[in-house]
């Protein structure tokens, strides 16, 4: 998390000012991806924890070198009236990639032997997919940027005179931080809530089913909300998602069995999907064309801070659970009520934001194939 918070804004800003035959972002995408792929070898060969930690830091650094400029490509290449759908595809691709690797690795465990064991094969598949993805991206983006080099250079020179941090962006960052904190709280403490508060006999199994349901609801909601946000604007869709997430979070406090948990979890998943898709589209809409790399890097700092904040809530939950005269799961009740409040706070903070509106279509863009 620390590496991502430092590397992404720094590399993003450098990429904004880069001029090369491959364009602004591609050199960093290639560098980061290639060295991250090479670093995967070190994971398997590391003889002790110290070496493994160093290898992991190396991989994380290079992943973030590629990731920040890669995310800026949405703002670089997609007209504003299609950013909603692009954001939906981005979120679904993230989830699908993770699901595929989990499924492949799970299938390989224990199925191979000898020098080519499941670890080498899994790492090899990951490296191969990474290199294939950056090859396709690099060719597509390089060709496109070469067609419009003069436009990008003039934008970068002009926009470098202005600061990225504005009151508008500040409100958005705080809003995103609190909503990501709420989302990450469910991911972090969901199993403990099911065990200690709902009282399920097999919380791990219930959580597994719940994840599948949430993933399905989230995927549908992400796709639909991206399309809708391109039609009606980002803020209304984010607010609908935030309100839905807040109400369904409070509804979870009434769950008494696995069936109720499953139903409520699907509503939470759908609401969070709506929120995430439109919120990421709004993040891109707020970006200055010439400083998308730095802008997205800063947005991701808020994302990282929200996820990290959720991890720090554990001791507070335990302390609240032990208050005399209160239920043993009092801490979880406060956590869920607080998460609902954070969803609402995030929506309220977005209300003063001025967006470009759905009628804007960039005139400086090459039509997409």
Where are the predicted features?
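Multi-pass alpha-helical transporter architecture, strongest
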Residues: 44, 129-141, 332, 337-369
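Intracellular juxtamembrane helix-capping segments at the cytosolic ends
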Residues: 65-78, 275-288
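A membrane-interface helix-boundary motif in multi-pass transporters
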Residues: 109-127, 317-342
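Glycine-rich segments within core transmembrane alpha-helices of 12-TM secondary carriers
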Residues: 4, 87-109, 300-311
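Hydrophobic core of transmembrane alpha-helices in multi-pass small-molecule transporters
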Residues: 39-42, 49-66, 260-274
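Short amphipathic helix-loop junctions that connect adjacent transmembrane helices
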Residues: 188-205
């Amino acid at each position: 998390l620390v590496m991502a918070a430092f590397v992404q804004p720094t590399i993003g800003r450098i990429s904004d000012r880069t001029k090369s035959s491959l364009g602004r972002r591609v050199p960093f995408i290639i560098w980061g991806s290639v060295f991250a792929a090479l670093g995967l070898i070190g994971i398997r060969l590391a003889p002790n924890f110290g070496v493994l930690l160093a290898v992991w830091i190396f991989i994380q650094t290079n992943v973030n070198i590629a990731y920040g400029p890669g995310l800026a490509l949405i703002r670089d290449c997609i007209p504003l009236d299609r950013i909603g759908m692009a954001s939906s595809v981005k979120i679904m691709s993230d989830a699908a990639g993770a699901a595929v690797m989990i499924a492949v690795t799970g299938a390989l465990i224990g199925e191979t032997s000898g020098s080519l064991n499941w670890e080498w094969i899994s790492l090899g598949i990951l490296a191969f997919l990474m290199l294939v993805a950056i090859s396709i991206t690099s060719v597509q983006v390089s060709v496109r940027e070469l067609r419009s080099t003069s436009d990008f250079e003039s934008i970068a020179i002009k926009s470098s005179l202005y600061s990225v941090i504005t009151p508008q962006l500040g409100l958005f960052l705080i809003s995103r931080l609190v909503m990501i904190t709420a989302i990450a709280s469910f991911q972090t403490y969901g199993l403990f809530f099911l065990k200690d508060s709902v009282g399920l006999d097999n919380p791990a199994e219930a959580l597994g089913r719940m994840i599948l349901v949430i993933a399905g609801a989230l995927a549908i909601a992400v796709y639909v909300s991206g399309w809708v946000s391109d039609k009606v604007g980002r803020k209304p869709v984010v607010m609908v998602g935030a309100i839905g997430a807040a109400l369904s979070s409070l509804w979870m406090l009434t769950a008494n069995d696995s069936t109720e948990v499953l139903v409520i979890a699907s509503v939470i998943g759908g609401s969070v999907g709506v929120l995430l898709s439109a919120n990421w589209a709004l993040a891109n809409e707020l970006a200055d064309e010439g400083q998308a790399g730095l802008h997205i890097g800063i947005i991701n700092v808020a994302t990282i801070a929200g996820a990290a904040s959720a991890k720090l809530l554990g001791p507070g939950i335990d302390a609240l659970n032990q208050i005399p005269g209160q239920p043993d799961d009092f801490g979880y009740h406060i956590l869920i009520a607080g998460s609902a409040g954070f969803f609402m706070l995030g929506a309220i903070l977005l209300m003063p934001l001025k967006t470009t509106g759905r009628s804007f279509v960039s005139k400086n863009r090459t039509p997409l194939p």
